[in-house]
Swiss-Prot record:
Domain of life: Bacteria
Subcellular compartments: Cytoplasm
EC assignment: 5.6.1.7
One term of GO molecular function: ATP-dependent protein folding chaperone
Species this chain originates from: Synechococcus sp. (strain CC9311)
Gene from which this protein is expressed: groEL2
UniProt family annotation: Belongs to the chaperonin (HSP60) family.
Keywords: ATP-binding, Chaperone, Cytoplasm, Isomerase, Nucleotide-binding
Lineage per the UniProt record: Bacteria, Bacillati, Cyanobacteriota, Cyanophyceae, Synechococcales
Keyword Isomerase: yes
Catalysed reaction, written as an equation: ATP + H2O + a folded polypeptide = ADP + phosphate + an unfolded polypeptide
Binding site for ATP: 29-32, 86-90, 413, 479-481, 495
Protein name: Chaperonin GroEL 2
Keyword NAD: no
Entry-linked PROSITE patterns: CHAPERONINS_CPN60
Length: 543
C-alpha cells in the first residue's frame, strides 16, 4: 500500500490535532463534577462511562496521521493504568499540556532533543518530590477515602473496599462479579490468586479486557507436562457432556495439545483455559496440592499411580468462579472450610519444624495465599449500562487503594502537582540552563493543568483557582465538589502517590517522544470508488 510521508512542523501539527481530540474527550470526566461519556457500541446497548482509559481505547479517527497522535497519548493512559490502575485521565491531561507548550517552543526554533532532556530531568526531580511528600496509609479510614475519590466520590464504595481490605488483609485479593440484586454487596470466601496467566491469549472470553472468566468450572490439576492431546481426550469428553467449563493447571502444555485446546475453545466445542502451575520443583507440587485442597479435587500425579488418561470427573476440583488475565489467575472457591483450615495447620507445623529462613518465607507465602481468602464484591445496578459503569469505577477504586498501600498518599484534586510547580521552577533555575531550562519550565507550566481542568469542569475559572492554590500551604487545595479551599488530607481528598507518579512519568515520556518527532510515515487514505450508476430510470435513454 502507498505511504505518505510528512516532515517537520506539518508532522507535529497533525499529531497535535489527534492529541487535542482525545484529550478533550477524556478531560470532560475529570474531577467530582466531571461529566460522563457515552460510547456507541456496534452490538448491544451504548455504554456510559467515566473512565479515561476506556474512552481512550474507543477513539479511532479517519485521518491516519491524526490517529497516530491519538495512539501516542492513549499509550500514556494505558501505561498508567497498567502500573497503577487509576489516574489515566490525569496522565492524558498532563501529556496534552506538555505537548502543547513544547510544540510552541519547537516551532519557535528550540532544539527538541535538548528540550526532551530538560523534561526528563524535571520528571525525575518531581518523582523524588512526590515520594518525599507521600504519607503512609495509617488506617482503614484513609483507605476508604482513597476508594471514595477513585470511585467518583461514592462513599459507600470506599467504605466497602476498606472493609474488604480489613477482612482479607492489605495484600489480599478483591474480586469483582456482577450481582443479582440492585445493592452492591461484599462477601468473603475461600480462594487464592497466583502469578501465572493464561498460556494463550485465545483463551480469553472477554476480548475487550483480555480476561478469561469461567463460571463453576471443573479444574484439572496435574504436575506433569501435557504433550499429547490423546492424554486429555477421555477427560475432555466427560466434561463436554456436562457442558461446564474446564481449567487446566499443569507444569506446561506443549504446542500440539495447546493448539487442539485453542481450536476447541474457538469453535465453541468446549469452554477451556490452561494455566502453567506457579513455582518450581517440589514447591510447585506443594502449591498444586494446596489448590487441590481448596477446590476439593485431586492432584493427578504419577507418584500416586494416577494417569491423565484414566482421570475421572470426581478427581477434578470445582470452583465458583475463575478469572484469568495475562499475569494472574484468581480462583474463588466455596464450601471447603474444614479441608482448607486443616491444610493451613499442616503448613504452620512445617514452618515450626524448618530451620531455613528461605523455606519459612515460602511456607508463609503459601499460608497467606491459602488462608487469606478472596473478598468478592457483587456489583448491583438497575440496568446493564449502570452495571458496566459501576464495575469500571469499582475497579479503579480497588487499584487505587492497593497503590495507596504500596507508596502512600498525597493531597488529591490536582493539588500536589500544582504545589510542586514553583519548587520545580526554582530548582530548574539554579540547576539547568538554556533549552534544558525551557524543557523543565514546560513541565512546570503543565503541572497545573489537571487542577485547572477539575475547576473548569466545576464551572469555575481554572487559572484563578490554580494561582490561589499555589499561594497556599502544601496540603491546602481546591475542593471542586463545594467550591471551597480546604486542607485536602483532613477533607479526605487524597490520591495514591503511585498514581500521581506514574501519570507524571508516562505523560513526560510521551511528550518527549512527540516533540522529537521529525517525520511521519503513514498509509495513504483509500480512495472511495465511485458508486455504480443505478439501473432503470436512466436519464437519456429511449425506451
Amino acid at each position: 500500500m502507498a505511504k505518505r510521508i510528512i516532515y517537520n512542523e506539518n508532522a507535529r501539527r497533525a499529531l497535535e490535532k489527534g492529541i487535542d481530540i482525545l484529550a478533550e474527550a477524556v478531560a470532560v470526566t475529570l474531577g467530582p463534577k466531571g461529566r460522563n461519556v457515552v460510547l456507541e457500541k456496534k452490538f448491544g446497548a451504548p455504554q456510559i462511562i467515566n473512565d479515561g482509559v476506556t474512552i481512550a481505547k474507543e477513539i479511532e479517527l479517519e485521518d491516519h496521521i491524526e490517529n497516530t497522535g491519538v495512539a501516542l497519548i492513549r499509550q500514556a493512559a494505558s501505561k498508567t493504568n497498567d502500573a497503577a490502575g487509576d489516574g489515566t485521565t490525569t496522565a492524558t491531561v498532563l501529556a496534552h499540556a506538555m505537548v502543547k507548550a513544547g510544540l510552541r517552543n519547537v516551532a519557535a526554533g528550540a532544539n527538541a532533543i535538548t528540550l526532551k532532556k530538560g523534561i526528563d530531568k524535571a520528571s525525575d526531580f518531581l518523582v523524588g518530590k512526590i515520594q518525599e511528600n507521600a504519607k503512609p496509609i495509617a488506617d482503614s479510614n484513609a483507605i476508604a477515602q482513597v476508594g471514595t475519590i477513585s470511585a467518583g466520590n461514592d462513599e459507600e464504595v470506599g467504605k466497602m473496599i476498606a472493609d474488604a481490605m480489613d477482612k482479607v488483609g492489605k495484600e489480599g485479593v478483591i474480586s469483582l462479579e456482577e450481582g443479582k440484586s440492585m445493592e452492591t454487596e461484599l462477601e468473603v470466601t475461600e480462594g487464592m490468586r497466583f502469578d501465572k496467566g493464561y498460556i494463550s491469549p485465545y483463551f480469553a472470553t472477554d476480548t475487550e479486557r483480555m480476561e478469561a472468566v469461567l463460571d463453576e468450572p471443573y479444574i484439572l490439576l496435574t504436575d506433569k507436562k501435557i504433550g499429547l492431546v490423546q492424554d486429555l481426550v477421555p477427560v475432555l469428553e466427560q466434561i463436554a457432556r456436562t457442558g461446564k467449563p474446564l481449567l487446566i493447571i499443569a507444569e506446561d502444555i506443549e504446542k500440539e495439545a495447546l493448539a487442539t485446546l485453542v481450536v476447541n475453545r474457538l469453535r465453541g466445542v468446549l469452554n477451556v483455559a490452561a494455566v502453567k502451575a506457579p513455582g518450581f520443583g517440589d514447591r510447585r507440587k506443594a502449591m498444586i496440592e494446596d489448590m487441590a485442597v481448596l477446590t476439593n479435587g485431586q492432584l493427578i500425579t504419577e507418584d500416586q499411580g494416577l494417569k491423565l488418561e484414566n482421570a475421572k470427573l470426581e478427581m477434578l476440583g470445582t470452583a465458583r468462579r475463575v478469572t484469568i488475565n495475562k499475569d494472574t489467575t484468581t480462583i474463588v472457591a466455596e464450601g471447603n472450610e474444614v479441608a482448607v483450615s486443616t491444610r493451613c495447620e499442616q503448613i504452620k507445623k512445617q514452618m515450626d519444624e524448618t530451620d531455613s529462613t528461605y523455606d519459612k518465607e515460602k511456607l508463609q507465602e503459601r499460608l497467606a495465599k491459602l488462608a487469606g481468602g478472596v473478598a468478592v464484591v457483587k456489583v448491583g445496578a438497575a440496568t446493564e449500562t449502570e452495571m458496566k459503569d459501576k464495575k469500571l469505577r469499582l475497579e479503579d477504586a480497588i487499584n487505587a487503594t492497593k497503590a495507596a498501600v504500596e507508596e502512600g498518599i498525597v493531597p488529591g484534586g490536582g493539588t500536589t502537582l500544582a504545589h510542586m510547580a514553583p519548587a520545580l521552577e526554582e530548582w530548574a533555575a539554579s540547576n539547568l540552563s538554556g533549552e534544558e531550562l525551557i524543557g523543565a519550565n514546560i513541565v512546570a507550566s503543565a503541572l497545573t493543568a489537571p487542577l485547572m481542568r477539575i475547576a473548569e469542569n466545576a464551572g469555575v475559572n481554572g487559572a484563578v483557582v490554580a494561582e490561589n492554590v499555589k499561594s497556599k500551604s502544601f496540603n491546602e487545595g481546591y475542593n471542586a465538589a463545594n467550591g471551597e479551599y480546604v486542607d485536602m488530607l483532613s477533607a479526605g481528598i487524597v490520591d495514591p502517590a503511585k498514581v500521581t507518579r506514574s501519570g507524571l512519568q508516562n505523560a513526560a515520556s510521551i511528550a518527549g517522544m512527540v516533540l522529537t518527532t521529525e517525520c511521519i510515515v503513514a498509509d495513504m487514505p483509500e480512495k472511495k470508488e465511485a458508486a455504480a450508476a443505478g439501473g432503470g430510470m436512466g436519464g437519456d435513454f429511449d425506451y
